[in-house]
A protein has these predicted regions:
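Juxtamembrane intracellular "pre-TM" segments in multi-pass secondary transporters
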Residues: 1-17, 200-236
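Helix-loop boundary and gating motifs at the non-cytosolic
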Residues: 13-64, 230-268
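Conserved MFS/SLC helix-loop-helix module at the cytosolic interface between two early adjacent transmembrane helices
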Residues: 70-106
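Helix-to-loop junctions at the C-terminal end of transmembrane segments
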Residues: 70-83, 279-292, 381
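C-terminal ends and interior cores of transmembrane alpha-helices
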Residues: 94-107, 302-318
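Cytoplasmic helix-loop-helix junction between adjacent transmembrane helices
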Residues: 117-156
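A membrane-interface helix-boundary motif in multi-pass transporters
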Residues: 170-184, 379-400
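C-terminal membrane-cytosol helix-exit motif in multi-pass small-molecule transporters
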Residues: 185-206, 405-410
Length: 423
């Protein structure tokens, strides 16, 4: 009986290259440290250091600017023969550790901005390198599950870090310790990559046959990527999806605050996170039966249903909490159905020698979506109650346009696959 239960438990986990599991473990440890500081940084720097709310906002926002630069450089570094995936990950961990220790020592606005610039740059380097490494270590339908495992490690580490950070603050009140722990977690991640991760970029150093001749200021690899119609159509789709996701992290809390108590809001977001963690691997496994554009169409439908349920909170006065619970649950599944499929799609269409650049562009879509989403949602929340509530209905209806673009993507993706099969 015991061996049967063990075999059933092991069968739940996908069979992946051990390097993927090691990378996910390192990321879990790193995200525990990030969770320590995620919600407490604005509080500490406003109340503990004495920065104004505007200064805190500017400082935290500067990380997004350097993050864009980090993603661009990270993509090029990941594809280079000198840096590769492994060295780029090591550089990311080292810079992130320095940034965390700098934040722990911050006493003024200048060092606060400098530390955030470093932090954003370090995280920007991370995403193209790690997603390219996962693509190198997997192929076919397994790749989608591998991305789900890495995202699961992110969510588990972040959730545990938030809980432990809250316990530490409530017992000691020492905010600077949180940033020191964050820095140590990046050092641990550095050690895991250095000792246990081999370079996965097996390119021969030659220019890809798909790479265009340089006819402008952009590097050849970026010109090639930005001339790929499949990728460009997906960029539009990806920006829309990330704009949706940004509403969960910025606008939804504001919308709930006028309808529910802070305790209820905390429970709703905890329910959302727990369900996302529990369904990440089962959902990615279920979606293996579809191609990537089809999986993203299902995800889009779930986003539309989720936003409609959020609209019911204000549009249908009765059972507000029930609508909120259902809406947050559907949006959790919508999120986990999107992230692995999106990354796996980009990895599948990218030439092997350009995976870092392609996945860098995929990561940049998140930066653009998060630049659009919060201001848009904030503007909607400042309007009259009727318009504020209608915002969620507009988002739900926008899904029809997204599905139309996804149908076009599916059409050209099928043609792409037919061309690849003839070669």
């Amino acid at each position: 009986m015991k061996s049967y239960l063990q075999s059933k438990l092991l069968s739940w986990f996908p069979r992946l290259n051990s390097q993927v599991w090691i990378l996910a473990t390192g990321r879990f440890l790193s995200e525990v440290g990030t969770g320590f500081t995620l919600f407490y940084a604005p509080i500490f720097f406003a109340k503990g250091v004495g920065l104004s709310a505007t200064e805190v906002g500017l400082g935290l926002g500067s990380a997004s600017i350097s993050g864009v630069l980090g993603r661009i450089i990270g993509g090029s570094f990941s594809d280079s023969q000198f840096w590769g995936r492994r060295r780029t990950l090591l550089l990311s961990a080292a810079i992130s550790a320095i940034a965390s220790f700098a934040l722990a020592a911050t006493n003024n606005f200048f060092t606060f901005v400098l530390a955030n610039l470093l932090a954003g740059f370090g995280i920007g380097l991370y995403w193209p390198a790690t997603e390219a490494a996962v693509a190198d270590l997997t192929e076919g339908q397994v790749r989608q599950e591998a991305y789900a495992v890495v995202r699961l490690a992110d969510n588990l580490g972040l959730g545990l870090g938030i809980i432990l950070g809250g316990i530490l603050i409530s017992s000691t009140g020492n905010y600077r310790t949180l940033f020191i722990i964050d820095g140590i977690s990046f050092i641990v991640f550095f050690g895991v990559v250095y000792l246990a991760i081999a370079e996965t970029n097996k390119g021969n150093g030659e220019t890809s046959s798909t790479t265009r001749k340089n006819r402008g200021f952009l590097p050849n690899s970026w010109q090639t990527a930005l001339s790929d119609r499949l990728l460009l159509v997906f960029v539009v789709i990806n920006i829309i999806f990330t704009t949706y996701i940004s509403q969960l992290h910025s606008t939804l809390g504001l919308y709930f605050s006028s309808r529910f108590s802070s305790q209820i809001i905390s429970i709703l977001f905890s329910w959302h996170m727990v369900l996302a963690i529990l369904t990440m691997i089962p959902v990615s496994r279920f979606f293996k039966r579809f191609n990537h554009p089809q999986a993203l169409m299902i995800s889009a439908l779930l986003w539309g249903i989720g936003f409609s349920l959020i609209w019911f909170i204000g549009g249908v006065p009765n059972f507000q909490l029930i609508w909120a619970i259902l809406g947050m649950g559907i949006l959790a599944i919508a999120t986990v159905s999107y992230t692995p499929s999106a990354a796996a799609f980009v990895a599948d269409i990218a030439p092997v020698t350009l995976r870092g650049v392609y996945l860098s562009i995929n990561s940049l879509c998140w930066a653009i979506g998060y630049a659009i989403g919060p201001p848009l949602g904030g503007w909607a929340m400042d309007q009259s109650p009727g318009l504020t509530n209608s915002f969620w209905l507009v988002l739900a209806f926008s899904v029809s346009g997204l599905i139309a673009i996804l149908q076009y993507l599916n059409h050209i993706f099928r043609r792409y696959n037919q061309t690849q099969e003839r070669r």
